[in-house]
Amino acid sequence: MSRTNFDTLLEAGCHFGHLKRKWNPAMAPYIFMERNGIHIIDLHKTVAKVDEAAEALKQIAKSGKKVLFVATKKQAKQVVAEKAASVNMPYVIERWPGGMLTNFPTIRKAVKKMTTIDKLTADGTYSNLSKREILQISRQRAKLDKTLGSIADLTRLPSALFVIDVMKENIAVREANRLGIPVFGIVDTNSDPTNIDFVIPANDDATKSVEVILDACCAAMIEGLEERKAEKIDMEAAGEAPANKGKKKSAKARLDKSDEEAINAAKAAAFLKEDEEA
């Protein structure tokens, strides 16, 4: 069963591409027709590509790995932040920090700096500083939080990147390509799908279009997370079963030994009684 359907995508306006003069020829396989100078995306292909991407994302989530969502354009910021948070995944909705992937250790240092500020503020270390110094530190903390707050839990490179506008987020895509990180992307008719591993041809300018596609993908990721949780519970239960079995066996051995000792004691008593009678 498909994660989404033609009518849902049509209602969300996923089929609207860009003006013909702005098109990228590499998107030709995904274009259905031209209407009033605007390219119309083939939604049947979009449905198939959403299913393909959703299944891959489900497996990534099931394996316990992270997917980094990227959307710095105004129309997609809020919806991406909400959907990514719903599956406990990191996201970037402000300016893409240069070297976010290729220079990840430096980014981690900045995140740790933010954590250190929080720790020192909580334990009262900064209470002896002047108001001006405290204000400077607070501003620095706010700046770091705005850019890196949503990736604070990302302790290692993500296993995949999910990009809303591959042309706008071209730096992020290039960094991922350089490191061999798979890229999922909503690709409009004016963009180049060449360096995108999982192409989802659709309107990347309409909030509703982005939301519908993310709904399908995140639903698949939730399934993956739930399956991972269920497997973990089963493994823990399986691990406890042999242990309990061993305990029962030991208890049985103790009972057998007690019975044997009782029998031997009874025999000894009978033997002594026979001696006395004799």
Curated annotation (Swiss-Prot):
Highest taxon of the lineage: Bacteria
Family listed: Belongs to the universal ribosomal protein uS2 family.
Pfam families given in the database record: Ribosomal_S2
Species this chain originates from: Bacteroides fragilis (strain ATCC 25285 / DSM 2151 / CCUG 4856 / JCM 11019 / LMG 10263 / NCTC 9343 / Onslow / VPI 2553 / EN-2)
Region named Disordered: 233-258
The entry's keywords: Ribonucleoprotein, Ribosomal protein
Lineage: Bacteria, Pseudomonadati, Bacteroidota, Bacteroidia, Bacteroidales
Name of the protein described by the UniProt record: Small ribosomal subunit protein uS2
GO CC annotations, alphabetized: cytosolic small ribosomal subunit
